């Protein structure tokens, strides 16, 4: 067991537990949003591994579901839920909120991914460390924008019953 990976998994899991506890204190819906973001992240990671095979995770992660480390899904949730909380706190208009959420999430990912590949957390296929954005292909960032935008759009739509009323 590699100490760096263990520290990352324990640390991110602890942050997720704290975030889940704080979300639950705000109500059931914020908690469900956080848990659904983690589930969404795990499913997307697993799907990418099976379908596209654009990258592979290090075998040094202690906890994984098939090819996707659980900590990755938890960090997805922390990033996406954190972005939506910031957008909500800033009072961004509902129609622009998913776009702002995406920009906030991609801002974090621009920094995280370049560091993560150098730490050996995962390896991109068909791209070297000097290519793309410090070794990260542009497609990764497009995916983050789309995934965050779509998750935010659906979550915010489900969150607000007035958006679902059908005029007769």
Regions found by a protein language model. Give the residues of each.
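Aromatic-rich, lipid-facing transmembrane alpha helices and their immediate juxtamembrane interface loops
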Residues: 1-168
């Amino acid at each position: 067991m590699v100490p760096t990976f263990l520290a990352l998994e324990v640390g991110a899991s602890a942050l997720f537990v704290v975030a889940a506890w704080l979300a639950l204190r705000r109500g059931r819906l914020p908690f469900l949003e956080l848990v659904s973001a983690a589930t969404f992240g795990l499913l997307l990671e697993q799907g990418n591994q099976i379908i596209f095979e654009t990258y592979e995770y290090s075998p040094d992660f202690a906890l994984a579901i098939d090819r996707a480390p659980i900590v990755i899904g938890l960090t997805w949730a922390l990033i996406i839920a954190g972005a939506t909380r910031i957008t909500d706190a800033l009072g961004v208009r509902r129609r622009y909120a998913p776009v702002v959420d995406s920009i906030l999430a991609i801002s974090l990912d621009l920094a995280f991914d370049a560091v993560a590949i150098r730490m050996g957390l995962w390896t991109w296929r068909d791209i070297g460390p000097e290519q793309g954005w410090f070794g990260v292909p542009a497609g990764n960032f497009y995916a983050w924008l789309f995934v965050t935008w779509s998750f935010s759009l659906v979550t915010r739509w489900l969150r607000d019953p007035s958006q679902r009323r059908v005029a007769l």
